Design a protein with these regions (language model features):
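Short, small/acidic-rich helices and loops at N termini and domain boundaries
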Residues: 1-83, 251, 324, 348-350, ...
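Glycine-biased, small-residue-rich flexible motifs in mid-sequence functional cores and linkers
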Residues: 68-71, 79-363
Length: 363
């Protein structure tokens, strides 16, 4: 670990653009750290204010403490030149020069962010959770900000699916904000996802850092789904960043009388894509609408089901058999269609026929 590179973003008044320039001309964090004042001004193009801030920070910073924090919290970092740096984020207007992370960074470009209001309604929570779950089951990574309300619902929904989910924090990764989501964040990491931040370890969650955080949420994804947002919601800042980066904006329509839907309904009026189902996202990007099924014992079947097969599968149980007649009533399918789909489910090994003629999920 280059502790110098990992420590430099903690210096006040050195923004992303400045640090990117420093790394491009000095090549390593150690060379930046040990550069003379003249070199920092001439090659690094630091202003007098930035120079004084860096010299003070360099003198007072406890590198050993930062190193121990990163070790204790299993915090890694990458720079723009590293292979693991998220590709979509790297190609934005203002990418973080150093990205800290806990867990595993996503390697796919099938990434969608879901954002929304903290004081979400039951409708908003249910919608966020369901869309995230269905997308995750179809190998789409869900990114959000880890806040209360819509963000948390999106992460929880994604955890019920197959793909990873990513939280973008507005503080150092040794901090937990909000504290109530500590267990959720640990589940995200355990599920193969990660928590990322552009802020050095030790940085508290300050208000001004949340809008800056939102550009990462927008930048590392193909599109942003806004689910419930007031007229001046932070989620609309994320949508603005998405527009700047040429990302797609999707909005879920809401109650026209509710304050919590004024922002999303406004987005729809000015041209955002209307999103009423996970299928709207899959259709927009031409992503295959198939998923892996997890049974109640959490055994994953590597069998791809069509939508009709999936509907039928959901009416089956692991422990209680269901008859053909019962399935006809519950699904409303024709007998010919039902028999054909049952045969396909049996051939794929996810459903078996019992000696009495009923059907159960294979164990």
């Amino acid at each position: 670990m280059d502790i110098y590179t990992a420590s430099i973003p903690g210096c006040p008044w050195l923004g992303s653009k400045t640090i990117r320039h420093l790394l491009s001309v000095f090549k390593t964090g150690e060379k930046i750290w040990n550069a003379t004042s003249e070199e920092l001004c001439e090659k690094g193009k630091l202003t007098s204010k930035q120079l004084n801030s860096f010299l003070k920070y360099r003198k007072e910073a406890d590198l050993e403490k930062i190193y121990k924090l990163m070790q204790n919290f299993n915090i890694k970092y990458c720079t723009l030149n590293d292979e693991v740096y998220p590709k979509l984020l790297a190609n934005t207007i203002n990418p973080p020069p150093v990205l800290y992370y806990r867990g595993k960074l996503p390697v796919t470009d099938r990434i969608i962010s879901i954002v929304g209001i903290r004081k979400a309604t039951v409708y908003g929570i249910k919608t966020a959770k369901e869309i995230a779950k269905e997308l995750s089951e179809r190998n789409v990574v869900i990114v959000s900000g880890g806040a209360r309300g819509i963000d948390s619902a999106a992460h929880k929904g994604a955890l019920e699916g197959k793909a990873a989910t990513v939280t973008v924090a507005a503080c150092g990764l040794d901090k937990t904000y909000p504290a109530e989501n500590r267990n959720l964040f640990e589940k995200i990491i355990a599920h193969g996802g990660c928590i990322i931040s552009e802020y050095a370890p030790g940085t508290p969650p300050l208000g001004r850092q949340f809008p800056a955080r939102n550009r990462i949420i927008a930048g590392m994804t193909r599109g942003v789904i806004v689910i419930e947002a007031a007229e001046k919601s932070g989620s609309l800042i994320t949508a603005d960043f998405a527009l700047e980066e040429g990302r797609d904006i999707f909005a879920v329509p809401g109650n026209i009388w509710a304050e919590s839907s004024k922002g999303t309904n406004k987005l729809l009026k000015i041209g955002a894509f209307c999103c009423t189902s996970y299928e709207d996202i899959l259709s927009e990007y031409g992503w295959e609408n198939k998923k892996e099924i997890k049974c109640k014992k959490d055994k994953t079947f590597n069998k791809q089901l069509t939508l009709e097969e999936e509907v039928l599968y959901r009416f089956c149980s692991e422990s209680v058999e269901i008859t053909e007649d019962e399935l006809l009533i519950k699904t409303g399918m024709s007998l010919k269609t039902l028999k054909s789909l049952l045969l396909q489910l049996q051939l794929k090994g996810v459903v078996i026929q019992t000696p009495s003629g009923g059907f159960i999920i294979s164990g």
